[in-house]
Amino acid sequence: EEGDNLAAFLAQFFPSPDLAITGISELFLNAVEHGNLAIPYELKSELIRVNRWKEEVERRLADPLYGRRVVTVSYRRSSESMAIRIHDEGEGFDWERYLHVDPSRATHNHGRGIAMANMMSFDELIYNDRGNEVTGIVYRRKS
């Protein structure tokens, strides 16, 4: 819920808030669930299938190993662009395979958030090498 509220607030600083909010929300969700809470893709698939996803998220949030981790967010605006940087305290991941919709995951019950953010919300997504920090950039259109 905190992530959704912050996403809605930050989206207002982008030229198309309705598009930006989707990407910001998805990137926040990934930072918390897959980054700080260290829930891998396959486990999330199984937890959703057996209807225990929310229970596992709550359990990990209460676990000091994961629950004390934070997501850091910064916003930067220049004459050329607007950018949001999201950093989590997780181990990182191999982000490249998620930048575009993979037909092999098309029927999965999750796993399209990064591709949606990349295609709909930002002109560019840049991850650090480790995969625990992403910057979403929207370039200003010249009139």
Question: What is each model feature region?
Answer:
Residues 1-29, 33-63:
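Bergerat-fold GHKL ATPase/HATPase_c domain
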Residues 42-111:
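Glycine-rich/acidic phosphate-handling loop/turn and adjacent ATP-lid/helix
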